Amino acid sequence: SIIADDHGRFSGLGLPCHADIVKGWGPLGGIYTALHHARPGGCFVVACDMPFLSGPLIRAMAGLTAGSDVLIPYLNGNYEALHAFYSPGCLEPIGRSIQRGERRVVSFFEEVAVRRVESAWIKEIADPARVFININYLDDLEKF
């Protein structure tokens, strides 16, 4: 599925498109909406501006999800929250974060089981410098 505040823009792609349930909450609101519409096992969330995804990395990460509510890459002291798996167990904690006015994706992590995927493990499968790059302008894309 595609989650976007302007979901009509993507309706021609042949994929289910859903508007944010909670408007104006950025990535946390998008994850909340994705989980609301997800299958019972949860979902993999990725940002729309990450064009160099690695299928092998995503599949390998999927194999690590058992026992965790959030499976998330952790590189250079930062979480890659928009390249992560989220279980249905995150839905209510995210809802509480939104009610408290918390906008940071990590705001609910203390309430759920989080498993970090360390950079050394990722580097065995994919190049983090490429996989986690964000392209915000066409000029950025031309560099690759």
Regions inferred by a protein language model and the residue ranges of each:
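Nucleotide and nucleotide-moiety/phosphate-recognizing core
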Residues: S1-E102, S107-A129
